[in-house]
Amino acid sequence: MAAPVRQTRSLLGWVTTLGPGSRGYRAPPPPRRSREPWWPDPDDPLTPRWQLGPRYAAKQFARHGAASGVDPGSLWPSREQLLELEAEEREWYPSLAVMQESLRVQQLAEEQKRQAREQLIEECMAKMPQMIENWRRQQQARREKAQADKERRARLQAEAQERLGYHVDPRSARFQELLQDLEKQHRKRLKEEKQRKKKEARAAAMAAAAAQDPADSETPDS
């Protein structure tokens, strides 16, 4: 307990030894503004450019009034500046009517978008049963085609084994070559059959057209 008391007394004694004349740092007072208007030298290269423009003149007029010698009419913006300010104000600070109209247009666009989406959903849902039926038909046709290809492949393999003998390995190169030849012959027969049916259908259509309009082939009586 005695040690802190002695430290406090020593600090107080050190402060008293500084004397009443000693004091700490004191900041200098701010520079006073001139009571008279001050105009910079335009010929001085160190003069800031903004002090030679209308901003500085407006500042002097705002501080000193008529004593600055500034014509108040020269402080008004020009027609071009007014138009620019009006355009900027319309862009960044639109009126209440403009804001309401913009909000109305935005809400109308959102409503139209929502209605279009709902209509699209309704149309898709109406087409869904037919789409499901078409998908099932495609799946059925795909399965039938795969089954037909499998059966055709089995028939060709059986025909190849009959020609080469059942002792031949189906994985051999000779068997595979014969199988490819049989497949080519089968595709050729299918193509010829398709062309024959097309010719027969064309001939039948021409015959039907000729039977429906026999008067075209006859010469009218003079």
From Swiss-Prot:
InterPro entries: Ribosomal_mL64, Ribosomal_mL64_sf. Residues 203-212 have a biased composition (Low complexity). It is found in: Mitochondrion; Nucleus. Residues 1-51, 136-170, 182-222 are annotated as: Disordered. A motif (Nuclear localization signal) lies at residues 184-200. Residues 141-170 have a biased composition (Basic and acidic residues). Residues 144-213 form a coiled coil. Keywords: Cell cycle, Coiled coil, Mitochondrion, Nucleus, Ribonucleoprotein, Ribosomal protein. It holds the Pfam family CR6_interact. The keyword Mitochondrion applies. GO terms for cellular component: mitochondrial matrix; mitochondrion; nucleus; ribonucleoprotein complex; ribosome. The keyword Membrane does not apply. Component of the mitochondrial ribosome large subunit (39S) which comprises a 16S rRNA and about 50 distinct proteins. Interacts with GADD45A, GADD45B and GADD45G. Interacts with NR4A1 via the NR4A1 AB domain. Interacts with ATAD3A and ATAD3B. Belongs to the mitochondrion-specific ribosomal protein mL64 family. Acts as a negative regulator of G1 to S cell cycle phase progression by inhibiting cyclin-dependent kinases. Inhibitory effects are additive with GADD45 proteins but also occur in the absence of GADD45 proteins. Acts as a repressor of the orphan nuclear receptor NR4A1 by inhibiting AB domain-mediated transcriptional activity. May be involved in the hormone-mediated regulation of NR4A1 transcriptional activity. May play a role in mitochondrial protein synthesis. This is Large ribosomal subunit protein mL64. It comes from Bos taurus. The lineage of its organism: Eukaryota, Metazoa, Chordata, Craniata, Vertebrata. The gene is GADD45GIP1.
